[in-house]
Amino acid sequence: MIEIRTGIGTDVHQLSAGVPMHVAGLSFPDETVGLVGHSDGDVACHAICDALLSATGLGDIGSIFGTADPQWAGAAGVALLGHVVALVTGEGWTIQNVAVQVVGQRPRMAARRAEAEAALAQTVGAPVSVSATTTDHLGFTGRGEGVAAIASALVTRGLKGEDSSLIR
């Protein structure tokens, strides 16, 4: 039997001065603020983790990387994502593609979108689409208080053959 599933994930982190900015597997050293979190606060990686876990029924980011676990304190978002990818593929799932949208006034993603897609695709092992938007200065993201991300993932299990990818 072939299983095809989708999952959705979201994440939000507060912005604060004196914290490094990491989003979509990239560092933004010129930013004067960064995302506060138990790990590096990478909202894109965290949303993708939740989308993959949701699609496969393996829980959520909080159940895998609880804030009480010191092993993940300060961990890079791509490290968390790599761990989730290993869990997902270890259960026989093939990740077909992922899409993630970063919502906030900063960091500006346009100039580094291709770089972010490449970094995330390398970790995920499947195509990743990255987009970004603002809320036209509305809400907490618009006021510069935080950044959010929304992700979707498509996974399959049970495809036979050398190449189990549906995406060409």
Swiss-Prot record:
Pathway in which this enzyme or protein is active: Isoprenoid biosynthesis; isopentenyl diphosphate biosynthesis via DXP pathway; isopentenyl diphosphate from 1-deoxy-D-xylulose 5-phosphate: step 4/6
Tell me the superkingdom of the source.
Bacteria
- Record's keyword terms, sorted: Isoprene biosynthesis, Lyase, Metal-binding
What is stated as this protein's family in its record? Belongs to the IspF family.
Q: What does this protein do?
A: Involved in the biosynthesis of isopentenyl diphosphate (IPP) and dimethylallyl diphosphate (DMAPP), two major building blocks of isoprenoid compounds. Catalyzes the conversion of 4-diphosphocytidyl-2-C-methyl-D-erythritol 2-phosphate (CDP-ME2P) to 2-C-methyl-D-erythritol 2,4-cyclodiphosphate (ME-CPP) with a corresponding release of cytidine 5-monophosphate (CMP).
Query: What does the annotation say about its assembly with partners?
Result: Homotrimer.
Instruction: Supply the name of the protein.
Output: 2-C-methyl-D-erythritol 2,4-cyclodiphosphate synthase
- Which species is listed as the source? Cutibacterium acnes (strain DSM 16379 / KPA171202)
Q: Which gene encodes it?
A: ispF
